[in-house]
């Protein structure tokens, strides 16, 4: 029996190393991480939260703080390590606004989910910073607005360029009618 528990511990250590490595890889690729306290969150509420986070293209993960701190070490998100105390969860996304919006909205309706802070790139954010980020339009909305701003001058230029040609055509048409009448 003693050999069996040693094998299980080795397996646990291997699983933990793999988890830390996968979390570190996520931190290397993502642009935003938010830390929340989920003390007392029911399974049903957690399931709803996960679904909303997933629908926004983000991830919500409850992780052991010690393992999360190991994964954060040496990354640009290292500044959020002090937030990892007690029952916490990490959320991340490539679109920083999406994950912040979902978590802020859910925290408004469920007091068991408490925002602790986060990080956007190398910038550590407090709770107010995460809430301010949630107020911004999403990345897709900003892209659409930018395309609209870029295309508006082009359509105006095309309209201006076409106007003289139309005026010339009307002038030539008037001369042609005048010559036919004469």
From Swiss-Prot:
GO molecular function, one term: large ribosomal subunit rRNA binding
Organism: Gluconacetobacter diazotrophicus (strain ATCC 49037 / DSM 5601 / CCUG 37298 / CIP 103539 / LMG 7603 / PAl5)
GO cellular component: large ribosomal subunit
The name this protein goes by in its record: Large ribosomal subunit protein uL10
Keyword Ribosomal protein: yes
Subunit structure of this chain's protein: Part of the ribosomal stalk of the 50S ribosomal subunit. The N-terminus interacts with L11 and the large rRNA to form the base of the stalk. The C-terminus forms an elongated spine to which L12 dimers bind in a sequential fashion forming a multimeric L10(L12)X complex.
Taxonomic superkingdom: Bacteria
CDD domains in the record: Ribosomal_L10
Role played: Forms part of the ribosomal stalk, playing a central role in the interaction of the ribosome with GTP-bound translation factors.
BP terms from Gene Ontology: translation
Keywords annotated in UniProt: Ribonucleoprotein, Ribosomal protein, RNA-binding, rRNA-binding
Database matches in Pfam families: Ribosomal_L10 (PF00466)
Gene3D superfamilies linked: 3.30.70.1730, 6.10.250.290
Family membership noted in the UniProt record: Belongs to the universal ribosomal protein uL10 family.
